[in-house]
Amino acid sequence: MTTIPIFFTFDHHFVLAAGVAFHTLLEKADARYHYNLYVVHTDLKPHHMKRLQHVVGRFPNAEVAFIDASEYDTGWAGLRHKSHFSKEIFYKLTAADLFPQYDRILFSDVDVIFTDDIAPAYFLFPDEKFYYAGTRPIQENNNLPRYRAHFTPEEIQTISQYEISAGFMLINLKLLRADYRQPQLTEFFRRNVDRLILPEQDCIALCLAPDIRFLDYKYVVCAAQYFNDPDQLRYNPNNPLLADRHAAAACYRKMLREVVQLHYPGADKPWNHPLTPRFDLWIRACRHAGLMGYYLQCQPQFLLQRLKRYNLRRFIRKHTGHAQ
């Protein structure tokens, strides 16, 4: 039986989200394949692992393993100006070392639900040279003006053409090892961490272009995108497939119909904020996963996190106002 490996990286705050994501992934899994799920972490406790093992254990063609990545914390601890990044992003760049037993692997965030099988993505680009594959932005990138102060025009152009979402990726581990590209990625990250905007995407684009491939848009669809009018959007000008507005709108509608991974980006998540777009889909998935009791148990923790974020925003606004 062919094995489909996929890894995730998160801390203990995302155990509930991971349980829901894992259950939806395996509900849609193809019975012809065996799915090996890996969790790269540094702070999960045995009871966290047991909960996730219970979810995955319901599916005969799947298993979950946990990789303690503490050895990478030494390098992470020495980085400057990293406070606005989660260290989990660093592990996405070190997959070739973390998984020496595989030639390729999938990666996914856990603030997601899956509505179709991920296996077809694993077999893409069989005869092409590539290091990473992911979805490129379908809408115009509003982050690019932020790059002008820290990146050269040539770097900005490369990022514009080769930026991919780091929320779902296919990674060619065999080629990364053969070409010794992982050390280049991690060294670039260390040297440039103070200027990176979207750290994984920036590193991948600037270090590995043009050997990057693009997945179908259906592999990462953000929940809020369901509330956009496809005929009124500003589309990514770097994608020639979107040059015609009618074709672009048709592509957008097709993406929404065929979504594989539904992503909930941002600080407000469906497990901590019931007004999150497409909350209904996530809470239904939570019930199907048998995790409603855990969802209710976690609410005080999530409320405390929201209060901390709220107080931090008030503090920043207050002191920014005084500075003005």
Predicted regions mapped to residue ranges:
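Short, acidic, metal-binding catalytic loop of nucleotide-sugar glycosyltransferases
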Residues: 24-33
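Short internal beta-strands
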Residues: 36-43, 134-135
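Short aromatic/hydrophobic "clamp" motif used to bind/position activated sugar donors
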Residues: 105
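N-proximal low-complexity "stem/linker" segments adjacent to membrane-targeting elements
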Residues: 1-23
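A glycosyltransferase accessory/donor-loop signature
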Residues: 1-4, 10, 166, 171-324
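Conserved donor-nucleotide/metal-binding helix-loop-beta segment in metal-dependent transferases, i.e.
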Residues: 112-149
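Active-site-proximal specificity loops/subdomain of glycosyltransferases
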Residues: 55-98
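Catalytic metal- and UDP-sugar-binding loop of GT-A-like glycosyltransferases, i.e.
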Residues: 108
